[in-house]
Amino acid sequence: MNNTDIKLVSVVIPVYNEEASLPALLSRVTAACDQLSQNYEVILIDDGSHDGSTELIRDAAAVEGSKLVGVLLNRNYGQHAAIMAGFETAKGDLVITLDADLQNPPEEIPRLVEAAMQGYDVVGTMRRNRQDSWFRKTASKLINKSVQKATGVHMSDYGCMLRAYRRHIIDAMLCCQERSTFIPILANSFARRTIELEVGHAERAHGESKYGLMHLINLMYDLVTCMTTTPLRLLSIVGSVVAGIGFTFSILLILMRLILGADWAADGVFTLFAILFTFVGVQLLGMGLLGEYIGRMYTDVRARPRYFIHQIVRSATTPSQQEAEQ
Protein backbone atom coordinates (compact mmCIF):
# COMPACT_ATOMS: atom_id res chain seq x y z
CA MET A 1 0.00 0.00 0.00
CA ASN A 2 1.09 3.60 -0.52
CA ASN A 3 0.31 7.06 0.78
CA THR A 4 -2.58 7.57 -1.68
CA ASP A 5 -4.63 5.03 0.30
CA ILE A 6 -4.70 7.41 3.29
CA LYS A 7 -5.17 11.01 2.22
CA LEU A 8 -6.74 12.33 5.42
CA VAL A 9 -6.19 11.23 9.02
CA SER A 10 -8.83 12.06 11.64
CA VAL A 11 -7.86 12.07 15.32
CA VAL A 12 -10.93 11.67 17.55
CA ILE A 13 -10.56 12.73 21.20
CA PRO A 14 -13.44 12.58 23.73
CA VAL A 15 -13.16 15.28 26.39
CA TYR A 16 -14.88 15.39 29.78
CA ASN A 17 -13.72 17.95 32.34
CA GLU A 18 -10.15 18.08 31.01
CA GLU A 19 -9.63 21.85 31.12
CA ALA A 20 -6.17 21.53 32.70
CA SER A 21 -4.96 18.98 30.14
CA LEU A 22 -6.32 20.59 26.97
CA PRO A 23 -3.55 23.15 26.22
CA ALA A 24 -0.80 20.51 26.41
CA LEU A 25 -3.01 18.00 24.58
CA LEU A 26 -3.64 20.30 21.63
CA SER A 27 0.02 21.27 21.40
CA ARG A 28 1.31 17.69 21.47
CA VAL A 29 -1.35 16.28 19.13
CA THR A 30 -0.74 19.04 16.59
CA ALA A 31 3.03 18.53 16.77
CA ALA A 32 2.64 14.77 16.26
CA CYS A 33 0.23 15.15 13.34
CA ASP A 34 2.46 17.74 11.65
CA GLN A 35 4.97 14.91 11.16
CA LEU A 36 2.51 13.03 8.93
CA SER A 37 2.76 13.18 5.17
CA GLN A 38 -1.05 13.07 5.03
CA ASN A 39 -3.45 15.89 5.79
CA TYR A 40 -5.21 15.64 9.14
CA GLU A 41 -8.03 16.91 11.32
CA VAL A 42 -8.39 16.73 15.10
CA ILE A 43 -11.94 16.23 16.37
CA LEU A 44 -12.55 17.13 20.02
CA ILE A 45 -15.86 15.88 21.42
CA ASP A 46 -17.01 17.73 24.52
CA ASP A 47 -19.02 15.15 26.46
CA GLY A 48 -21.02 17.58 28.59
CA SER A 49 -18.08 19.04 30.56
CA HIS A 50 -18.78 21.23 33.59
CA ASP A 51 -15.44 23.06 33.66
CA GLY A 52 -13.94 25.32 31.00
CA SER A 53 -13.31 22.53 28.48
CA THR A 54 -16.25 23.56 26.28
CA GLU A 55 -15.01 27.13 25.87
CA LEU A 56 -11.45 26.01 25.18
CA ILE A 57 -12.62 23.62 22.46
CA ARG A 58 -14.94 26.19 20.91
CA ASP A 59 -12.22 28.88 20.82
CA ALA A 60 -9.53 26.55 19.43
CA ALA A 61 -11.78 25.18 16.68
CA ALA A 62 -13.00 28.63 15.59
CA VAL A 63 -9.50 29.95 14.81
CA GLU A 64 -9.08 30.70 11.09
CA GLY A 65 -7.27 27.86 9.33
CA SER A 66 -7.43 25.61 12.40
CA LYS A 67 -7.38 21.87 11.84
CA LEU A 68 -9.43 21.36 14.99
CA VAL A 69 -13.13 20.51 14.92
CA GLY A 70 -15.22 20.91 18.06
CA VAL A 71 -18.20 18.61 18.55
CA LEU A 72 -20.28 19.77 21.51
CA LEU A 73 -22.77 17.28 22.97
CA ASN A 74 -25.75 18.59 24.93
CA ARG A 75 -24.92 16.45 27.99
CA ASN A 76 -22.69 13.64 29.20
CA TYR A 77 -23.31 10.39 27.30
CA GLY A 78 -20.17 8.45 28.20
CA GLN A 79 -16.82 7.88 26.53
CA HIS A 80 -17.86 5.44 23.82
CA ALA A 81 -20.98 7.35 22.79
CA ALA A 82 -18.84 10.48 22.51
CA ILE A 83 -16.35 8.63 20.31
CA MET A 84 -19.19 7.45 18.06
CA ALA A 85 -20.24 11.10 17.70
CA GLY A 86 -16.67 11.82 16.63
CA PHE A 87 -16.80 8.97 14.11
CA GLU A 88 -19.95 10.48 12.62
CA THR A 89 -18.15 13.80 12.15
CA ALA A 90 -14.78 12.42 11.00
CA LYS A 91 -14.00 12.49 7.27
CA GLY A 92 -10.64 10.72 7.34
CA ASP A 93 -9.62 7.57 5.50
CA LEU A 94 -7.99 6.56 8.79
CA VAL A 95 -9.47 7.45 12.18
CA ILE A 96 -7.37 7.41 15.35
CA THR A 97 -8.89 7.54 18.85
CA LEU A 98 -7.02 9.02 21.80
CA ASP A 99 -7.90 9.84 25.41
CA ALA A 100 -7.60 13.45 26.53
CA ASP A 101 -5.73 12.73 29.78
CA LEU A 102 -2.33 12.40 28.01
CA GLN A 103 -1.58 9.07 29.66
CA ASN A 104 -1.19 7.65 26.16
CA PRO A 105 1.36 9.80 24.30
CA PRO A 106 0.09 11.53 21.12
CA GLU A 107 3.62 11.12 19.76
CA GLU A 108 2.68 7.51 18.92
CA ILE A 109 0.20 8.67 16.24
CA PRO A 110 2.70 8.44 13.33
CA ARG A 111 3.47 4.82 14.30
CA LEU A 112 -0.21 3.92 14.10
CA VAL A 113 -0.54 5.56 10.69
CA GLU A 114 2.53 3.71 9.44
CA ALA A 115 1.12 0.38 10.67
CA ALA A 116 -2.25 1.05 9.02
CA MET A 117 -0.49 1.76 5.72
CA GLN A 118 0.80 -1.82 5.81
CA GLY A 119 -2.75 -3.02 5.18
CA TYR A 120 -4.19 -3.48 8.66
CA ASP A 121 -7.86 -2.70 9.24
CA VAL A 122 -7.42 -2.06 12.97
CA VAL A 123 -4.25 -1.05 14.79
CA GLY A 124 -4.59 -1.69 18.52
CA THR A 125 -2.17 -0.83 21.29
CA MET A 126 -1.11 -2.20 24.66
CA ARG A 127 0.35 -0.07 27.41
CA ARG A 128 3.97 -0.62 28.37
CA ASN A 129 4.96 -0.05 32.02
CA ARG A 130 1.55 1.17 33.12
CA GLN A 131 1.67 4.03 35.60
CA ASP A 132 -1.71 3.34 37.18
CA SER A 133 -2.34 2.20 40.74
CA TRP A 134 -2.12 -1.47 41.72
CA PHE A 135 -5.92 -1.60 42.02
CA ARG A 136 -6.50 -0.26 38.51
CA LYS A 137 -3.90 -2.57 36.95
CA THR A 138 -5.30 -5.62 38.77
CA ALA A 139 -8.90 -4.75 37.88
CA SER A 140 -7.89 -4.17 34.26
CA LYS A 141 -6.18 -7.57 34.05
CA LEU A 142 -9.22 -9.33 35.50
CA ILE A 143 -11.56 -7.55 33.10
CA ASN A 144 -9.31 -8.29 30.10
CA LYS A 145 -9.15 -12.00 30.95
CA SER A 146 -12.88 -12.26 31.65
CA VAL A 147 -13.85 -10.51 28.44
CA GLN A 148 -11.43 -12.57 26.35
CA LYS A 149 -13.04 -15.75 27.67
CA ALA A 150 -16.60 -14.48 27.25
CA THR A 151 -16.31 -12.86 23.82
CA GLY A 152 -13.58 -14.92 22.18
CA VAL A 153 -11.96 -11.68 20.97
CA HIS A 154 -8.30 -11.84 22.00
CA MET A 155 -6.85 -8.43 22.72
CA SER A 156 -4.10 -7.71 25.20
CA ASP A 157 -5.36 -4.37 26.50
CA TYR A 158 -9.02 -3.41 26.12
CA GLY A 159 -8.58 -0.27 28.20
CA CYS A 160 -6.09 1.46 25.91
CA MET A 161 -8.07 3.71 23.57
CA LEU A 162 -5.13 4.79 21.41
CA ARG A 163 -6.20 2.90 18.28
CA ALA A 164 -6.48 3.35 14.52
CA TYR A 165 -9.40 2.26 12.32
CA ARG A 166 -9.76 2.19 8.55
CA ARG A 167 -12.68 4.04 7.00
CA HIS A 168 -14.68 0.91 6.17
CA ILE A 169 -14.46 -0.21 9.81
CA ILE A 170 -15.79 3.18 10.95
CA ASP A 171 -18.67 2.99 8.46
CA ALA A 172 -19.54 -0.52 9.64
CA MET A 173 -19.63 0.58 13.29
CA LEU A 174 -21.83 3.56 12.46
CA CYS A 175 -24.35 1.16 10.92
CA CYS A 176 -24.75 -0.62 14.28
CA GLN A 177 -27.71 0.66 16.27
CA GLU A 178 -27.18 -0.90 19.70
CA ARG A 179 -26.98 1.59 22.57
CA SER A 180 -24.36 -0.25 24.64
CA THR A 181 -21.20 -0.31 22.58
CA PHE A 182 -17.57 -1.10 23.34
CA ILE A 183 -15.69 0.20 20.35
CA PRO A 184 -12.49 -1.94 20.35
CA ILE A 185 -14.43 -5.22 20.37
CA LEU A 186 -17.02 -3.96 17.90
CA ALA A 187 -14.29 -2.84 15.49
CA ASN A 188 -12.47 -6.17 15.72
CA SER A 189 -15.68 -7.99 14.80
CA PHE A 190 -15.54 -6.29 11.38
CA ALA A 191 -11.77 -6.40 10.84
CA ARG A 192 -9.93 -8.93 8.72
CA ARG A 193 -6.38 -7.90 9.64
CA THR A 194 -5.45 -6.51 13.05
CA ILE A 195 -2.22 -5.79 14.87
CA GLU A 196 -1.23 -4.58 18.34
CA LEU A 197 1.65 -2.22 19.08
CA GLU A 198 3.30 -1.49 22.41
CA VAL A 199 3.02 2.17 23.40
CA GLY A 200 4.24 4.23 26.33
CA HIS A 201 2.11 5.15 29.30
CA ALA A 202 2.39 8.11 31.68
CA GLU A 203 0.84 9.11 34.97
CA ARG A 204 -2.20 11.35 34.82
CA ALA A 205 -0.85 14.88 35.27
CA HIS A 206 -4.16 16.64 35.91
CA GLY A 207 -7.40 15.65 37.59
CA GLU A 208 -8.57 12.16 38.46
CA SER A 209 -9.55 9.15 36.41
CA LYS A 210 -13.20 9.06 35.36
CA TYR A 211 -13.24 5.27 35.92
CA GLY A 212 -13.79 4.47 39.59
CA LEU A 213 -14.75 1.09 41.04
CA MET A 214 -18.40 1.26 39.98
CA HIS A 215 -17.47 2.52 36.52
CA LEU A 216 -15.12 -0.47 36.10
CA ILE A 217 -17.87 -2.87 37.21
CA ASN A 218 -20.34 -1.27 34.79
CA LEU A 219 -17.71 -1.47 32.06
CA MET A 220 -17.29 -5.20 32.62
CA TYR A 221 -21.06 -5.71 32.37
CA ASP A 222 -21.12 -3.63 29.19
CA LEU A 223 -18.25 -5.58 27.67
CA VAL A 224 -19.78 -8.97 28.38
CA THR A 225 -23.48 -8.36 27.77
CA CYS A 226 -23.32 -6.11 24.71
CA MET A 227 -21.17 -8.45 22.61
CA THR A 228 -22.04 -12.04 23.51
CA THR A 229 -24.66 -14.36 25.00
CA THR A 230 -22.00 -16.61 26.53
CA PRO A 231 -22.94 -15.62 30.13
CA LEU A 232 -26.49 -16.85 29.52
CA ARG A 233 -25.18 -20.20 28.30
CA LEU A 234 -22.80 -20.34 31.25
CA LEU A 235 -25.70 -19.56 33.59
CA SER A 236 -27.63 -22.51 32.17
CA ILE A 237 -24.66 -24.79 32.76
CA VAL A 238 -24.14 -23.52 36.31
CA GLY A 239 -27.86 -23.89 37.01
CA SER A 240 -27.82 -27.49 35.79
CA VAL A 241 -24.77 -28.31 37.91
CA VAL A 242 -26.28 -26.71 41.02
CA ALA A 243 -29.58 -28.53 40.46
CA GLY A 244 -27.71 -31.82 40.11
CA ILE A 245 -25.74 -31.21 43.29
CA GLY A 246 -28.92 -30.23 45.13
CA PHE A 247 -30.74 -33.38 44.01
CA THR A 248 -27.81 -35.60 44.95
CA PHE A 249 -27.51 -33.94 48.34
CA SER A 250 -31.24 -34.38 48.96
CA ILE A 251 -30.95 -38.13 48.33
CA LEU A 252 -27.93 -38.25 50.64
CA LEU A 253 -29.83 -36.45 53.42
CA ILE A 254 -32.76 -38.87 53.13
CA LEU A 255 -30.43 -41.87 53.36
CA MET A 256 -28.56 -40.40 56.34
CA ARG A 257 -31.89 -39.69 58.03
CA LEU A 258 -33.01 -43.29 57.59
CA ILE A 259 -29.68 -44.72 58.73
CA LEU A 260 -28.77 -42.41 61.65
CA GLY A 261 -32.19 -41.29 62.83
CA ALA A 262 -33.94 -38.01 63.54
CA ASP A 263 -31.31 -36.64 65.94
CA TRP A 264 -28.71 -36.44 63.18
CA ALA A 265 -31.11 -34.63 60.87
CA ALA A 266 -31.85 -31.96 63.50
CA ASP A 267 -28.16 -31.28 63.99
CA GLY A 268 -27.77 -30.56 60.26
CA VAL A 269 -30.16 -27.62 60.17
CA PHE A 270 -27.41 -25.02 59.78
CA THR A 271 -25.88 -26.98 56.92
CA LEU A 272 -29.23 -26.91 55.18
CA PHE A 273 -29.48 -23.16 55.67
CA ALA A 274 -25.99 -22.67 54.22
CA ILE A 275 -26.88 -24.74 51.17
CA LEU A 276 -30.18 -22.89 50.81
CA PHE A 277 -28.44 -19.52 50.87
CA THR A 278 -25.99 -20.76 48.24
CA PHE A 279 -28.80 -21.78 45.92
CA VAL A 280 -30.65 -18.50 46.52
CA GLY A 281 -27.45 -16.58 45.77
CA VAL A 282 -27.03 -18.41 42.46
CA GLN A 283 -30.66 -17.68 41.58
CA LEU A 284 -30.30 -13.97 42.38
CA LEU A 285 -27.11 -13.80 40.33
CA GLY A 286 -28.91 -15.39 37.41
CA MET A 287 -31.85 -13.03 37.76
CA GLY A 288 -29.50 -10.05 37.83
CA LEU A 289 -27.74 -11.21 34.68
CA LEU A 290 -31.04 -11.77 32.90
CA GLY A 291 -32.10 -8.31 34.05
CA GLU A 292 -29.00 -6.81 32.42
CA TYR A 293 -29.90 -8.37 29.07
CA ILE A 294 -33.58 -7.44 29.35
CA GLY A 295 -32.67 -3.88 30.31
CA ARG A 296 -30.41 -3.54 27.28
CA MET A 297 -33.12 -4.94 25.01
CA TYR A 298 -35.57 -2.40 26.45
CA THR A 299 -33.09 0.41 25.80
CA ASP A 300 -32.53 -0.75 22.22
CA VAL A 301 -36.27 -1.13 21.55
CA ARG A 302 -36.89 2.50 22.56
CA ALA A 303 -34.37 3.44 19.84
CA ARG A 304 -33.40 6.74 21.41
CA PRO A 305 -30.30 8.44 19.98
CA ARG A 306 -26.99 7.41 21.53
CA TYR A 307 -26.03 11.07 21.65
CA PHE A 308 -27.24 14.46 20.52
CA ILE A 309 -24.79 16.89 18.92
CA HIS A 310 -25.61 20.38 20.13
CA GLN A 311 -23.07 22.20 17.94
CA ILE A 312 -20.15 21.57 15.60
CA VAL A 313 -17.50 24.29 15.58
CA ARG A 314 -14.90 24.50 12.82
CA SER A 315 -12.94 27.14 10.96
CA ALA A 316 -14.00 28.34 7.53
CA THR A 317 -11.52 26.04 5.79
CA THR A 318 -10.88 22.63 7.32
CA PRO A 319 -8.65 19.79 6.04
CA SER A 320 -11.69 17.73 5.04
CA GLN A 321 -13.01 20.61 2.96
CA GLN A 322 -9.60 21.03 1.35
CA GLU A 323 -9.65 17.33 0.41
CA ALA A 324 -13.10 17.72 -1.14
CA GLU A 325 -11.93 20.69 -3.19
CA GLN A 326 -8.96 18.70 -4.49
Curated annotation (Swiss-Prot):
The keyword Membrane applies. Its EC number is 2.4.2.53. Pfam families: Glycos_transf_2 (PF00535). It catalyses: UDP-4-deoxy-4-formamido-beta-L-arabinose + di-trans,octa-cis-undecaprenyl phosphate = 4-deoxy-4-formamido-alpha-L-arabinopyranosyl di-trans,octa-cis-undecaprenyl phosphate + UDP. It is a multi-pass membrane protein. GO terms for molecular function: phosphotransferase activity, for other substituted phosphate groups; undecaprenyl-phosphate 4-deoxy-4-formamido-L-arabinose transferase activity. It comes from the Bacteria. InterPro entries: ArnC_tfrase, Glyco_trans_2-like, Glycosyltransferase_2, Nucleotide-diphossugar_trans. Catalyzes the transfer of 4-deoxy-4-formamido-L-arabinose from UDP to undecaprenyl phosphate. The modified arabinose is attached to lipid A and is required for resistance to polymyxin and cationic antimicrobial peptides. This is Undecaprenyl-phosphate 4-deoxy-4-formamido-L-arabinose transferase.
